[in-house]
Amino acid sequence: MSYVIDRRLNGKNKSTVNRQRFLRRYRDHIKKAVEEAVSRRSITDMEHGEQISIPGRDIDEPVLHHGRGGKQTVVHPGNKEFTTGEHIARPQGGGGGKGPGKAGNSGEGMDEFSFQITQEEFLEFMFEDLELPNLVKRNLTGTDTFKTVRAGISNEGNPSRINIIRTLRSAHARRIALSGSSRAKLKEATVELERMKREEPDNFGDIQELEVEIDRLKARIRRVPYLDTFDLKYNLLVKQPNPSSKAVMFCLMDVSGSMTQATKDIAKRFFILLYLFLKRNYDKIDVVFIRHHTSAREVDEEEFFYSRETGGTIVSSALKLMQEIMAERYPSSDWNIYAAQASDGDNWNDDSPICREILTKQIMPFVQYYTYVEITPREHQALWYEYERIGEDYADTFAQQQLVSAGDIYPVFRELFQRRLVS
């Protein structure tokens, strides 16, 4: 039995280009299906793709054909039923099927076209047109990254980067240049030898001299090396500076006793979606997790999402801790600072004005964007209205939205992080 081993880099995805073209063509259908899937799934259930269905009528290719009206003169093969000049009734129009009623044995149609998109494609459509607002490049000394780019051909380089086509082309050109005169003389001598053998077969001396000359020319041509170090050509790769934007996202989650388990679950889902978005779209970004009730603590990812600690409610404790961490580790001159806060809006009454004061004086002047989501089906409380006053002063860098159920998470998330036009 014979085995064929496919060593091509893209062997198992030979139609990758066609698939990408298909995804671009039906982007609207796929995007709508992804949005429906996100609202249907749990936010944590993002480990697989999605089955997409496109109506058959939407994948039909446009074709040119004759219209159904008008008169036509057609010559048909001879038959026993009709003679010259007879008129044939026009067939009744209609679709392929027989319409309502009993099943028939004729007619045809097309089912919906279904296909599977991968997890990577699913996330690409899920986070399409989303970005961190106001992201700018900071002047960072010594923190530039580099990317390797093609920069033409070089005569020196690493053997692993040899350009075979350019090398063989150079070798061929060199051999032609060095042996060109010898090949021309060899051609002339060969023609002369054939003429003498044909017209002067008895002139052994001249014939022998020509044969010796031909052998000498062939030897000279063979001495030209097939490949020389001069011929070697390498793909030149250079490092190009790639200034990076350093960013940090502060995640502030209320875990006080007023937050029911359902409310906490919605908050966690919102932050899971945010964390997934950040890690997929940005290579260099720090995420600081802060949980708070009457006091605030910086925690790791595991504790942020799964700790069961609870208590009273003093929102300003989280804002004070965020300001301290900013001053200690993330100066605004070097970092793009973002924050996302989730709460049910329930706060100690005297603390809400303090939150507005801390945000207005110590946080908002130094951040690129601050988002607040309030998870409650009830009327807003004092904290929401204090934050509304902040939004009036910082319309471009502050946003607040309300979440009522888990189905609101994705639409609100897109609203908060929708890509904006730069004027």
UniProtKB/Swiss-Prot annotation:
Region (Disordered): 65-110
InterPro entries (UniProt xref): UPF0229 (IPR006698), vWFA_dom_sf (IPR036465)
Record's compositionally biased regions (Gly residues): 92-107
Pfam families per UniProt: DUF444
NCBIfam families: PRK05325.1-2, PRK05325.1-3
Family: Belongs to the UPF0229 family.
Record-linked HAMAP family: UPF0229 (MF_01232)
This protein's name: UPF0229 protein PSPPH_0628
Protein species of origin: Pseudomonas savastanoi pv. phaseolicola (strain 1448A / Race 6) (Pseudomonas syringae pv. phaseolicola (strain 1448A / Race 6))
